[in-house]
Amino acid sequence: MDLKTSALSRLEGQLRACFFSDSTLADFSDDAYFWSGQNIRGKICLDLGSAYGLSEDALLDIAASTQLLHDASLIHDDLIDEDTERRGCLAIWKKYGKAKALLIGDLLISKAYQIVIQSKVSAATKVVWTSEISAAVSSAVSGAVAELEFDTHNQQLILENYYRMASRKTGALFALPARCIALTADQPGDVDRLNTIFLNLAVAYQIKDDQSDFLGTKSGRQHSSDLKNGRPNLYHIFVNNGMSAEKYFDYIDDYQASLVADSIQLADSLPKQVYVILKELLIPLIELKPLQSSNRLLQVGT
């Protein structure tokens, strides 16, 4: 077992201990919903944190708290959108009911703070982490509200408003561990660049998610769920504006590619491991299907 695998195993153990130690969460400790993800945040924390020289214990605390926040956001998202599956498992609301799903999501947020409180880092670092978590949660809620109220009428502002919405809703929590790591390592000059990188990649991932919804290839989600639920989806927006498939596929692809290119450029001025994380871990997750391979699905999507 290599060092990263060992650390990821420790992370899962820490998360399971968090579940077992709470009488309410203990009932969910064996639910695959919480243990079947790709552990992206844990991998980011370990890879990025090692580049900044942080201890494994501190990195695992950052990873555990941000993973709990991520799980809470997924539970709430599934509930709001009424998506029935996640990670190949029944959504929490579908399996246990909407009221319990709401409460479990809230409880996970509180547990994220508890991990910070119980961490062995300095009191000053705990204050920093707590502040960052509070800001990220507030931003995620703001983005979720913006998603519900998204205005598609002003075509010139579609991409600007979409970026603002997705960078808050998805990006704030995604950038959280990187921000905590740089601040803990006393590298405040890197925070803004890391923040922009992870916001960009989160928006790029949201575009990938939009395409999956549009093409009907996402497990557990009704086909064109975004359209039925009134959620902003770039593909549906541009279809409704009368764009040809070739034009809107190219337009969206170019926009996503610009986000990735900007992130890679910013990574050049940061520790080399940031570039490795982008190229080997994150960019493969956001690759869009080209128009040529999507033609069979477009009749359904439109």
Feature map (PLM): residue ranges:
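All-alpha prenyltransferase/terpene-synthase fold signal
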Residues: 1-302
